[in-house]
UniProtKB/Swiss-Prot annotation:
Belongs to the metallo-dependent hydrolases superfamily. Peptidase M19 family. This is Uncharacterized dipeptidase C3A11.10c. Interacts with dil1. It comes from the Eukaryota. Residues 1-39 form the signal peptide. Its cofactor is Zn(2+). Its EC number is 3.4.13.19. The keyword Ligase does not apply. It comes from Schizosaccharomyces pombe (strain 972 / ATCC 24843). Zn(2+) 1 binds at residues 67, 69, 181. It catalyses: an L-aminoacyl-L-amino acid + H2O = 2 an L-alpha-amino acid.
Length: 409
């Protein structure tokens, strides 16, 4: 038996060191969450209805969406002048009020810039002069995301590493990450890629709707590189070194496979759906889904009706569920699925998923299909956080010098 004289009781919180107090507060909060869950289970008459499952998951685990185009919406409609508007209520598909209704806990904001028009006097499949302008515009889009967090500090929290998401969630903040959507935005320069990373960009889509010097686009591309160019292989390895996520959405199947051959990180698609459900070039083929499983990666399912259904006008929330179920069937689990709605970058929406407030309805639908709380939590955000952390850890383990060539094409 341990005597009272030898039993070391914890000091009152106000007498503990700051770091110890912080750790204790986190532990107490975790304990409260566990007790809350036990309380749910302990009520003899409690029934886990689909609605209760969905609510439990979305209030205990951060929902992280892989792709939202609010920044370009703000540019095109308001010239990025945030002081002239309120982000609480906007006429598009995303605003603070509806993000809260949708229980969004984290968002990868796309700092998208359109592909430059090709030079009719050049035989190249890219326009380097136009790409230089895209670099400038990308910096402006990064800035607008940072100003979102500056002007709404109780809502948005700039987040540059995966471990911060859980703490943002506990503070009721929406983790705000950034991704560039096409390597035309770096104008052939790995140094620009590195500077974007230092500014907070955490994924880069290899191509948008145009080929670039690195990779081929699935839509409006010309198969210029027949997948990845030699420079593209180098840039994928540089992204691995940085700990930046390699995003394969928008790319051709050849590009997907070749990138997975080169990359040491898990496969990642920020906003793509299943080609096995609808044969659209923006979707992921089944043979690539197998590789997603092999690399322990994730496909963030897109909601755009034109990508998910041969009859876009008839697309519904159930259409999105079918894509999710197909990916689960091919990969053998729900471990490789996330959500990348593409809101404010799409001109039509599925019935039942009209805006960012509708995520709870999607989780109810998934719960009705028999998904467990663990599986729902995986789809909500645990899968993408796993992929992100693995990518970060691999970056820390790569001890190579930065890629030093500049625009050598």
């Amino acid at each position: 038996m341990v005597s009272d004289s030898k039993l070391e009781l914890p000091l009152p919180v106000n007498q503990q060191k700051p770091r110890r107090r912080r750790i204790l507060k986190v532990h107490l909060l975790i304990a409260a969450l566990i007790l809350s869950a036990v309380g749910y289970l302990g009520k003899g008459k409690w029934i886990w209805t689909p609605e209760r499952k969905a609510h439990f998951v979305l209030t205990h685990f951060p929902l992280i969406d892989g792709h939202n185009d609010l920044p370009i919406y703000l540019r095109e409609n308001y010239d990025n002048r945030l002081l002239n508007i309120s982000l609480e209520h906007l006429p598009g598909q995303t605003d603070i009020f509806r993000l809260r209704q949708g229980h969004v806990g984290g968002q990868f904001w796309s700092v998208f810039v359109e592909c430059p028009s090709l030079d009719s006097n050049s035989s190249l499949s890219w326009n380097r002069t136009g790409e230089y302008e895209a670099v400038t515009q990308t910096l402006q889009q990064i800035d607008v995301v940072k100003r979102m967090a500056l002007y709404y500090p109780k809502t948005f929290s700039l987040t540059d590493h995966s471990g911060k998401v859980k703490f943002d969630f506990l503070r009721n903040h929406i983790s705000s990450m950034m991704g560039i959507e096409g390597l035309h935005q770096i104008a052939g320069s790995p140094s620009i890629l590195r500077q974007f990373y230092d500014l907070g960009v955490r994924y880069a889509t290899l191509a948008h709707n145009c080929d670039n010097v690195f990779a081929d686009a699935a839509v409006d591309g010309k198969r210029t590189n027949k997948g990845l160019s030699p420079a593209g292989r180098d840039i994928v390895r540089e992204m691995n070194r940085l700990g930046m996520i390699v995003d394969l959405s928008h790319t051709t199947p050849e590009t997907m496979h070749q990138a997975l051959d080169v990359s040491v990180a898990p496969a990642f698609f920020s906003h793509s759906s299943a080609k096995g459900v609808y044969d659209h070039p923006r979707n992921v083929p089944d043979d690539v889904l197998i590789r997603v499983k092999e690399t322990d990666g994730v496909v963030m399912v897109n909601f755009y009706p034109a990508f998910i259904s041969p009859h876009p006008e008839n697309a519904t929330i159930d259409t999105v569920v079918e894509h999710i179920m197909h990916i689960a069937n091919v990969t053998g689990s729900y471990r490789h699925i996330g959500l990348g709605g593409d809101f404010d970058g799409i001109d039509m929406v599925p019935k039942g998923l009209e805006d960012v407030s509708k995520y709870p309805d999607l989780f109810v639908k998934l719960a009705e299909r028999g998904l467990s709380i663990t599986e729902l939590a995986d789809i909500a955000g645990r899968n993408v956080l796993r992929v992100w952390k693995t990518t970060e850890d691999l970056g820390h383990s790569i001890h190579e010098p930065p890629l030093e060539w500049e625009d050598d094409f």
